[in-house]
């Protein structure tokens, strides 16, 4: 997570004597959803830098109250993004592009089979960064529960996880990294639906070495066998819309319970 420090100058147009500037949009006014490529008759992937430039344009408009809160849905070409805490020695050497970005967190992978969502949302007064992140997590937790999957938060860790069990350690299904500037969030979440998770093998995802990465497809197959039905990115994105809309209304909500931390034997007794 990354939050820019306040400055002495106002970042957005101001209401003077009750008169709003031309083009002013009150927040929240619901959420507007943009589907980049994934809703096409022949779905296409979007290059990361192209989408990042679009994010910045949308962020400028939302923070200036010239556009409603917007969620950008996208599936990226293979790429690593390195948050501000990433050390150079953590970069992979497999030839996949690495893009340094201005969000919090460390390095992660994006690619085919992963739904990436960028909520560009003006944070109401009193809504802090942690509260915002918890709301994004809650939306994903509720989403995967619609498919019979029990996920949750792990204390001290960001994102959405499946608990440690006899088959392995805690497994992250959704990574979250944001930046807040001009009271408006950008960047967002990456939900693994059915990616080739080998892309994570060349890095320590988000700098966490004692956990694993999973996907909705992998968890569904664990429950129902190899022929389990796996939803498409478009289906998941559509089902997530009303949940995100509810969470981004910033009304009180009941938070899902945390997953208890349990050390897996593989990390209690490492190989010599």
From Swiss-Prot:
Annotated BPL/LPL catalytic domain residues: 65-255
Binding locations of substrate: 103-110, 175-177, 188-190
Additional remarks: In the reaction, the free carboxyl group of octanoic acid is attached via an amide linkage to the epsilon-amino group of a specific lysine residue of lipoyl domains of lipoate-dependent enzymes.
Principal location class: cytoplasm
InterPro entries: aa-tRNA-synth_II/BPL/LPL (IPR045864), BPL_LPL_catalytic (IPR004143), Octanoyltransferase (IPR000544), Octanoyltransferase_CS (IPR020605)
EC number: 2.3.1.181
Functional summary from the UniProt entry: Catalyzes the transfer of endogenously produced octanoic acid from octanoyl-acyl-carrier-protein onto the lipoyl domains of lipoate-dependent enzymes. Lipoyl-ACP can also act as a substrate although octanoyl-ACP is likely to be the physiological substrate.
UniProt protein name: Octanoyltransferase
PROSITE patterns: BPL_LPL_CATALYTIC, LIPB
Gene for this chain: lipB
Site positions (Lowers pKa of active site Cys): 172
Domain of life: Bacteria
Family under the similarity heading: Belongs to the LipB family.
Active-site residue list: 206
Pfam family, one: LplA-B_cat
HAMAP family: LipB
Catalytic reaction equation(s): octanoyl-[ACP] + L-lysyl-[protein] = N(6)-octanoyl-L-lysyl-[protein] + holo-[ACP] + H(+)
């Amino acid at each position: 997570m990354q939050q820019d420090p306040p400055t002495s100058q106002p970042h957005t147009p101001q209401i003077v004597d009750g008169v709003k500037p031309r083009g002013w949009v009150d927040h929240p006014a619901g959420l507007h959803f943009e589907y980049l490529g994934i809703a096409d008759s022949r779905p296409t992937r979007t290059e990361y830098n192209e989408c990042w430039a679009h994010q910045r344009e949308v962020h400028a408009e939302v923070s200036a109250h010239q556009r409603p809160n917007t969620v950008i849905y996208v599936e990226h070409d293979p790429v690593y993004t390195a948050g501000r805490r990433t050390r150079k020695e953590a970069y992979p050497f497999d030839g996949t592009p690495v893009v340094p970005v201005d969000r919090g967190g460390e390095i992660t992978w994006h690619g085919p089979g992963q739904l990436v969502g960028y909520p560009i949302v003006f944070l109401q007064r009193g809504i802090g960064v942690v509260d915002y992140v918890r709301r994004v997590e809650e939306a994903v937790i509720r989403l995967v529960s619609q498919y019979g999957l029990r996920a949750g938060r792990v204390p001290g860790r960001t994102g959405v996880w499946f608990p440690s069990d006899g088959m392995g350690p805690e497994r992250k299904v959704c990574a979250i990294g944001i930046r807040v500037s001009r009271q408006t969030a950008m960047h967002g979440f990456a939900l693994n639906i059915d990616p080739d998770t080998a892309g994570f093998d060349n890095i320590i995802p988000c700098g966490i070495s004692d956990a694993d990465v999973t996907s909705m497809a992998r968890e569904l197959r664990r429950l129902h066998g190899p022929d389990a039905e796996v939803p498409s990115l478009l289906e998941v994105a559509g089902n997530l819309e009303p949940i995100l809309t509810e969470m981004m209304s910033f009304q009180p909500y009941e938070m899902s319970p945390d997953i208890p931390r349990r050390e897996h034997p593989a990390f209690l007794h490492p190989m010599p």
